[in-house]
Amino acid sequence: MKAMHYTLEQLNQASADAFVAALSGIFEHSPWVAEAAALQRPFANIDTLHHTMSKAVETAGEAKQLALINAHPELAGKAAVRGELTAESTREQSGAGLNQCTQEEFDRLQALNRAYREKFGFPFILAVRGYDRHGIIANFEARLNNSRADEMRASLDQIYRIARFRLDELIDA
């Protein structure tokens, strides 16, 4: 099924409910981000919309930020195996070849997912566009050496990158 596309003008003029529904997939399972942005319309460009949505997350407090981080699936994780990813996550993970892992790569990703979640208490997040499986695994391994505070920051920054990619796919410039 082809994803809907909108113009910024359509989103600016939409009801708050329609705006939130259109942007509900931008920040994984977190419509509250779109709800906050709806109050700031109109937007002159996608950059401003993205900044406003990201700022809503930045100012939300750690509990909401952690909930947003935890709303993201593990890379090549259980949700992917069970076919429970959102359409956006499925496209992104497939685009990086995570649906074509060898058994060895899959086992390595599963071990990294467990180690990362055990150390930090949330899933590893990476905007996978532009990465192949080997690059994802290398990034995963390197980030396991970070502090929890550094990984919270890295996770949010990656979420903002994912959101920008999703906005660019959804909105016709």
Where do the model's predicted regions map?
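C-terminal non-catalytic interaction appendages of large macromolecular assemblies
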Residues: C101-A173
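Surface-exposed, charge/polar-rich loops and edge strands
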Residues: F19
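Aromatic-anchored, charged helix-turn/loop surface patch used as a conserved interaction hotspot
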Residues: H5-Q13, G25-F27, V33-L112, R161-A173
